[in-house]
Amino acid sequence: MDVIDLTKALVAKRSITPDDAGCQPMLATMLSEAGFEVSHHRFGEVDNLLATHGGASPQTGPHILWIGHTDVVPPGPEDQWSSPPFEPTERGGELVGRGVADMKGSDAAMVVALIDFVERHPDHAGRVSLLITSDEEGPAIDGIRAVVPHLKATGLWPDVCLVGEPSSHAALGDRIRIGRRGSIQAVLRIEGKQGHTAYSLPEDNPAHRAGPLIAALGALEFDDGDEAFDPTRLQISNLQAGTGADNVSPGELVMYFNIRNNPNTPADALKRQIEDLIEAHDPGPWALNWRVSAEPFGPCSGEYLDGVVQAFEATLGQAPKLDTGGGTSDGRFFGPEGVPVIEAGPVNATIHQIDERVALADLKKLPEVFHAMMASILGVR
């Protein structure tokens, strides 16, 4: 099956997170028939597929682990799509469908490249593996995170991770990610006293008391960033207060915010800074809950990155820009432990949008690029 047909077959499966919807069994069959050792790892409602070929050691060569995901975000209002989101449609030189860019096109390209690689080089140096989950777009608890202990216990911990996430900006290969900022979620609850607006006092209203604090949080500066990372930033994502009635003052205000932090501001220091700020503004009785969903990692450097850059130059005729922008990926489960993580994939301009799409020419080129990345790292011609 070529990469276009395989992408279409994957997109046609309604795999809204965490439902794999049969994507992984199809890929597992292809990889098994090509000589890969395949294992399935299900945790809760999440499916994870691991396929591996060869052996890695300091004598034989490194272990390359490709990472992907078969789950997609919901399509949104399906009547706003120009064609049904789970009926992959070619139009104007592009393939349209939910998940075609994030990241079923890359899933297909990784599988095609891996099968082609081991067919051409059955006795290749090192080990090449693929780990795919159906829990990347969701909580990411029963996905890659849950498989990590198995990798460590069975000697399958990688030397380098290649992630097929859509990293390109305007053209295929113009950008790859060599690290990521962390992601921290917080929920702040400020107590007040619910009452009739005609009788409530300003000091009873948590929305009034929170005003200066909201402004201070929005203006908070943590660091200046550096040549590899943007500054750490906080964004308030939700504010909830009141009953919906215009004559009832709220008894509680709930504020949700997200922080993207670089390595210069670790989570513990960031938490202390924010908690000190809340104390200083004294908004009344409050409680704050934290959840760290990703630690920052990178930027990576060295021979593996050099090999990937050389592969891009050879196949696409240009050296990619190296950056650490964007959101989080499943590289978060390897990068903070010292594994170089390199993310390379198609253009990300339409991911999570209505009429998500990718250029057919880019899809056809991806397996060649991915093959060249492996060949360059393993020293195979």
Regions found by a protein language model. Give the residues of each.
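Short beta-strand segments
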Residues: I67-H69, L131-T133, C161-E165, R189-E191, ...
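Active-site metal-coordination/substrate-binding segment of hydrolases
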Residues: G61-S129, T154
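Metal-dependent amide/peptide-bond hydrolase catalytic core
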Residues: P166-A171, I178-G179, I184-R381
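Acidic/histidine-rich catalytic neighborhood of metal-dependent amide-processing enzymes
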Residues: M103-G179
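A structural signal for isolated positions on well-ordered beta-strands in alpha/beta enzyme cores
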Residues: S39, L65, S129-L131, A287
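N-terminal helical capping/dimerization or prosegment-like subdomains
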Residues: M1-G76, E252-Y256, L270-K271, L360-D362
